[in-house]
Structure formats: structure tokens, C-alpha cells
Amino acid sequence: RKQINIGIAVALDWGLIVPVIRHADDLSLSGITRALNDLAARARAKKLSPEEVQEGTFTITNPGVFGSLMGTPIINQPQVAIMGVGAIEKRPKVMTGADGEDTIAIRTCAYFSLSFDHRVIDGAVADQFLAFVKKTIETFPETGL
């Protein structure tokens, strides 16, 4: 069985560090949140062990935290992919109303980007993954938080 170890990019005054949430696929959303908060806090306090920044398989980075709408992250080898999350903003969007007519609505939006190793992941599969992320975020119940 393959491990899913998610790297979380943490910006520090002296550079960037990527602690790893090990076996993320075995954790609940709240478990991932706890692990992320713990690793980020210890990264900022310079209290990570070398093992906690190794063996990531996929990284999530957030250039949006600095106000950037999007970025094109580079894969940290030997990982297979990295996803960038841009700034979350309210934007006008064309929506289809209940009557079937187009209407303008204000929606919370963000751009996501995915860089991946084509030797490991087919482009169509990567695109399907991003579509899945989009659908999951758009339909995630607020009570699920």
C-alpha cells in the first residue's frame, strides 16, 4: 500500500520549510487540521525533527496567503505533485438562476494550480483530480467544518 504523506509549505522569516503530514489518507479532516496546526507551529518555533520534513509525496502551498491570485509551484523531488492555492476573494460570477436565466452573483473564489510529474501521473488524471477538488470545495457543507 502506498503512503499519502502531504507536505505543507510554511513560510518563515528565513525561508520556506515543508513539514509532512504522514498517512494523511488515514486521518479525518479534523485530524489533518490538528496535524497541520501542530507542524506549522513547531516549524515557526524551529522545533521540527529532520524526519518531519522527509518522505512527502504531495505538497500543498498557498501563495494566496501573501495576496497572490495564483502561482505555479515547482515539484519538490521525489514528490509527484504540488498544488498551489491562490488568494480567496469575492468576485462577480455569472450564475444560472432558478428560472434558467443568467444572473450576476457575488461568490467566494480562488485559483488552484497543480504541477505534477508526468512520469507518474497522466495529465487527464491530474485534471480530474483538480475537478474533484473544485467540486468538493463547492459542495462541502459548512456544518462539516
Kindly give the residue locations of the regions a language model identified.
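C-terminal catalytic/motor cores of large multi-domain enzyme assemblies
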Residues: 1-145
